[in-house]
Amino acid sequence: MLVSVLVILFVPWHQESNFSLVNNTSMHYVRARVLSVDAESLQSDDLEPGRVAGAQEITVQILSGSLKGQTVTLTNYVTRSVNVVCKEGLRIILCIDTPENAEAYYTVYNYDRGGGLLLIFGLFIGIVLVVGGKRGGFSLLGLAYTVFVIFAFLIQAVYYGWSPALAGFLTVLLTGAASVYLIGGPTRKTVAAFLATMAGVLCAAVIYTVCAAALHLSGYNLDTAESLILIQNQTGLHVSGLIFCAVIVAALGAVMDVAVSVSSSLQEIHQLNPDRSAKELMHSGMNIGKDMIGTMTNTLILAFVGSALTTVILLKGYGYDMALLLNSDYVAIEVTEGIAATLGVILTVPLASAISAWLFTLEAKKPLQSNPSKKKRRTGCLARRFSSLFFQNLPVKAHSSRCLPNGNCLSR
């Protein structure tokens, strides 16, 4: 893990580029606190009870940036899409536009959610540590490493022209190995879970590749393809492989969950009953995995449906009929991603069962040894003979012994 972090941080593996889709050099975002609401004209929204619309005259104090400490007065426009209602003491994000040869223009961008997010993260970390203990701490370390690899390596590599498939598989390899090792340590269970995870992700990748070829899908079918092509012209971004990369990264979490659960269960069964054969262990793993398949399948499908819900509603609002909706690029991409990831999870169950059963029952053949009790008796007899040669004059307890032709000695 440490080596990969150092490589990602210090090796110049990407080219520098200052390309941006928009020219926002004149815009700055700073934190601010509302000192007072000087005047307001707000009306209730008839279509959405509890929301208001209108305008407010507010005075704010800037808390960050080069203008820290200054006080400004501005108009806050409250609309349905930008609905930030200011009150005294509220912390907000302020947008400062400073074009050339013009006065600075201030607008309320959004709520300052930094403190709330820190509180939520702290609560999450605390619960994981309390419930999970030491292993919970290792899982948090694995999560931090995963986030680091995604933002510091995957996004940067794909943006600057790396193959999305290569960058995606390297990300899966690094994060999968680190997460599984931190959870299980250097054990056969860890090896089994890691191999099953890689095999499951590979299955998801193969299934997506076949489905994408059959449905004529690529990154150019994304809604954001036009903007991505502009980036491609400047940085060498490979638009066509973006969906493939997204599928294998999205499938990693669920596949790893199933692989670790199955391998851990089979390790426990093997420790309680070491005489079970590999076939019996695999059968037990399949029985355990069948219950997991139903819940994990629902989880993945519902996750993809939830992410696509608002877009499908929007398409329906445009008057798309069912046939047109089902044949749209967006629905085809979402369905293909969901099916590929789900089938990868399902196939992980037999893969994890087979790999775990094989590894747990893999024992080195031990050479045949003579009866240890006979060896011990022979050793004792030789010891007494050795003692009689060198310690004849020492007073010892009287005893007599008779050695048989086979080397065993009888004492009386």
Model-derived features with residue positions:
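Hydrophobic secretory-pathway targeting helix
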Residues: 1-24
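Structural detector for short beta-strands of small beta-barrel domains
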Residues: 26-54
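Extended, hydrophilic extramembrane loops/domains of integral membrane proteins
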Residues: 78-115
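Transmembrane alpha-helical segments that form the functional core of multipass membrane systems
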Residues: 122-128, 134-229, 239-250
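Pore-lining and gate-forming transmembrane alpha-helices of multi-pass membrane transport proteins
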Residues: 193-197, 201, 232-233, 237-249, ...
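Helical hairpin unit composed of two closely spaced alpha helices linked by a short loop
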Residues: 252-262, 266-312, 319
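Hydrophobic alpha-helical transmembrane segments of membrane transport and translocation systems
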Residues: 303-375
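Positively charged N-terminal leader segments that act as targeting/secretion signals
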Residues: 367-368, 375-390, 394, 398-399, ...
